[in-house]
Amino acid sequence: MGTVYFTRAVLPEMIKNHYGKIINVASVAGVYGNANMVHYSATKGAVISMTKALAKEVSAQGICVNSVSPGSVSPAENRDMDYFEDSQLSFMGRTGTANENANLICFLASEEANYISGQNIQIDGCRKKQ
């Protein structure tokens, strides 16, 4: 619900200014669904659906709404250590990094991404569908 509450809080000012960027963080679990993670998968899927629906409502007012769905990410404290099991989920053979996710979010927040809205962008190293 935090995504909904935060959006409600910032949207009026964005509408008033005819400009804004909303970038939600979902997960590949919301795209594919993960076994034994039904609640997590469902809520992340809801974030993706909310992103697409809200973009249709506010894009004409200069507001871009997108979501990012990371795959497996190695913790910063283990930057040099890749988790073998998680790395097997990607055709790239490794997990992602926090910086790779942050770079995508920074791009979506930039003016270079002013024509991108209503998208869920997976950053998952070409994840193998389960």
Regions found by a protein language model. Name each.
Residues 7, 43, 51:
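Active-site helix of classical SDR
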Residues 9-21:
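A short helix-coil junction within the Rossmann-fold of NAD(P)-dependent oxidoreductases
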Residues 27:
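Residue(s) in the substrate-gating loop at a strand-loop-helix junction
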Residues 33-41, 53:
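Active-site loop-to-helix junction immediately N-terminal to the catalytic Tyr of the SDR YXXXK motif
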